[in-house]
Amino acid sequence: MALQERRAAVTSSDILSAHAISSPALAAAAINFAASFHRDARTCCSAHERSQLQKVYRDKILANDKFTANIAAAFLSVLGPNAGRNDAGAERERWGDFDRLAQRGKNMRDRESQHLQHQSGIIAAWGPRCFEYYGWHVLPLPLLRQVHDLAVLIPSWDDAVELLNSRMLLRHELRVLHGNNKALRIGEHSAASKVQDSRSPVERTDIVAALDWARANATSAAARQAVKEAAQGMNGTPINTFGLKRDCYGMVVPSVGPYDPDGDDDNDEDVVDVSPRPAKHIKLSAAEPLRLMFPGSLSHVQACQRHDTDGEKASTAPIRSNKLSQSKQPELDTAAESLRTRHIHNERINEPLDEVSDCSLSLQTIAVGGGSAQEETPDQDVEHAHPEVEITSAISSELRKVDERTDGIRIGRVIMRRSHCMVREQDNQTNEEGTGEVQSQRDRRARDLGKDMETDMDIDSQLEEMLDIHALEAQRNHEEMSDGEDVVAGVAGPGTPTHRAAEEGGCREKEAENAKTDEEQVQDKAALDQAGNTNTNREVENAAPKAHSQEGALRASRTGTIVERTVELHSTHSIHQRASVNTTAPTVARSSDSDDSDSLHSPTALQNLQAYIDTRTHQLTQVLSQLNSTPDVRHHAQLQLDWLSPQRWASVYVEPEHHMGATSSASSDSADIWCLDWDTFHQYADSNHVFRRPVVIKQKFQDSGMYEVDRYVDMLWQRFPEQHIEVQNSITGTSRLMSMAEYCSTALTVTEAGTSLSDNTTSVSNAVNLRCLARADEPLLTRLERFQLLSTLASRVAGTIGRTEHSPPSNLESLLGFDALSFADAFSSSHANLFGGSWVRCLDGLKIYAIAADLDAEDWRRFADEGYKWSPRGKGRLIALEEDDVLFIPPGLRAIHASFTPEPCLMEGGMLWDECAIPEILDELLWIARHQAGTVQPLEFQLSSLIDALEQWLNENNHINQSSPSHTAAEERQTLKASIQSLRDCLSGRSAAFPS
């Protein structure tokens, strides 16, 4: 009887009326239809009732086939792929009609149809409430498809949520218990994640891992039971021990945060320690160094706190506001004024480097806690600092939030060590230089650097001390706050226990907090009293070692994460500040020794980027040295080691130095790489300068930051769902064809997980033969007339080639623009540009180019014999590219190069010729035609028409050097014609050996 009522209700409803309805109305109707099925399916008590319910909904879908092909596709798995297929007669025909309708819906490739299919399928299985609660309706299509596949395999929400919980707890355990910094805690989202809803703790990796498990174990009762047990805790410990709980739909979430409406928890032991989420990648653009280096500094946090408190003061009452008396209001006003002053100071920090190079950015003038004990008179008792403690507590909370948002800090420790070494080396060289002014400048820089770092550490140490005093709830009378200069209550130099503990980081933070006793808190208070009653900076310096000797190490380990980050940030800034000072200092004679040159100059932006990559490449070389499963794998791994180990970073000539750092080469001629901004490159190009070295161009793009690897992979699937893609394996060096569906699924998993040298990563290491699909803005150098020669000739011969069946690398027009998509630890093998010069722009991620340019005849003979297996034998030089960097390999520069990928990277580039280097281009093409047998037939096929067009172009007096004297121009023209004829003869002879 109940089933008949449901049948009548569904039949009489107008959810999917056959009348014309708009697309949004159709989507809403489809969602309601799926929700209705979920509700009715839950009331079925037997298989027979469910079978009858399936027929009811099948008939309803068939009655509105004009509008419901998408719904049929979504319900194909929900109603069961084999449901009723064994029936005879009319029922069998009805199921056949339903299958055909569903297939028609599956063939719809537009985004709207596919979103509708997957959303309806998920809601029909799990219901609409959890789907809307977690905001899954805004998931990108590839991830939504994977959630739908999971719902098909695990149709019960109770089972599905346990499976997702078990996957989330695995990564949470890796981070909290095993210290894996790449793993995300539950509730954290990576920068590249598309699951950003505040109530959804799942990441793409959780969904993919759950889907992989379901495909293998969905029918195993024992496996499901094991999953339920794993979802109850970590290593047998309940989840609430780690600051986790279950939300209203059974999902494991943090017990405090956006998942808790109250947002308040006084039990600090239940909350896991907070540290920065894993960064997608580091951006060290030289255009805005200070804005990058200071986002987590204390002044920035206080400025943020200023903005936050202004907006919330009227609506949110402080938790302990009843403890504040009216007499403390002046102190709060003073604290607010101090925060406002530091907000202005922070805005100056965010100015361009050249505008603030002469400004003092020392953090010694920052008042801790909005003007608390640091601004009191010597006779004032610090235990009455309640209002300021309230502010410092908020600042401490804000520090943790900013730590989670700040991603570009991983290289600070390396740069800090380099900066100390540079200062010491500079001091040791002062006697040889004999310049008093240089000596005084270096002394000031060293003194400022030490004070700034020491001040930063003491500021954070005092924050913790004041919080401890607040815990003691001390009550004493206040005196008027001093209007004098801020005093910092301790200096912890590089040799003190505080600094050594800060170097070790925050790994002992939890243990130190548990070990903190009331007696130690009293000692902290005494140390702060001693520092707070100090009148002069000299007394501060004398008191600091004594105050910090007993408690410094413990305090620094407790606040290690905050102190280390602040020191790293300010140390990095100090390096940039010294680079600015060097531009006005007297010129120092450069030594021919590269090591001495490095000690005399501040690191360039490229060298800072290289410092970050050093650790990554070292780890890669260690892994490669252990790969010896087969001879091919061992040989290919050795080839990568020949390029990477030992690391030989290119010497860089930088111009202009004041903008991008300092040159690391003795001269422009001896440099391996040039690094220029666009204006400087443009000046060289306008003067018809022939570039003899690769050039890294720093240029600003309007579309900067608009390209991401995962979005590009999604675009590939949308455009070419039924095609195959050629990919190269970085372990074996071999290439194979993969279906686009398999490639995109694996690539998205790799992008989210951040894995390297795993089976998944190596299988999709390099996507080759990609034409220009990103359509990013090209660098401005391609707009210069002298670099448009190849595109001009290609346009002249367009339509005369007569073939289209070539692979993309052999297609002339495809060489004018191409994309390169690589994943972690991808290696491209050794190769030379087929058509001369090239440019590549890094759209997303990081890339290392290894270039061997200064080669002799023996090296080129080996390359002709070995091809992509050629080893540089120590002649390769490395250069790192970050987002928006452009690498220009000049036409006519004969060089062999390979590329490595530290993290997923998307690049776009193209080939070009230079009108100022036509003789060199012809020589390069002649060498390739003689030695590259694998490209002879397609090379001859394309160059035969291209050379004719070039000769005609030269006869029209289009050569850029036509202003030369007549006799010189005639000689150049005859030389070019002779080279063209030699190339034509070579191609004709080899074409006879390789007939079509």
From Swiss-Prot:
Name its GO BP terms in alphabetical order. Answer: antibiotic biosynthetic process
Q: Which residues form the signal peptide?
A: none
Tell me which UniProt keywords the record has, alphabetically.
Answer: Antibiotic biosynthesis
Q: Where is the composition biased (Basic and acidic residues)?
A: 440-449, 500-527
This protein's source sits in the domain of life called Eukaryota
State the phenotype upon gene disruption.
Answer: Abolishes completely the production of KK-1.
- List every stretch annotated Disordered: 307-333, 425-449, 489-556, 571-602
- Induction summary: Expression is positively regulated by the KK-1 cluster-specific transcription factor kk1F.
**Polar residues bias located where?**
318-329, 428-439, 572-590
Q: In which pathway does it act?
A: Secondary metabolite biosynthesis
Explain the purpose of this protein: Part of the gene cluster that mediates the biosynthesis of KK-1, a novel cyclic depsipeptide with 10 residues which is a promising active compound with high activity against many plant pathogens, especially Botrytis cinerea. The role of kk1D in KK-1 biosynthesis has still to be determined.
Please report the name of this protein according to its UniProt entry.
KK-1 biosynthesis cluster protein D
Q: Which organism is it from?
A: Curvularia clavata
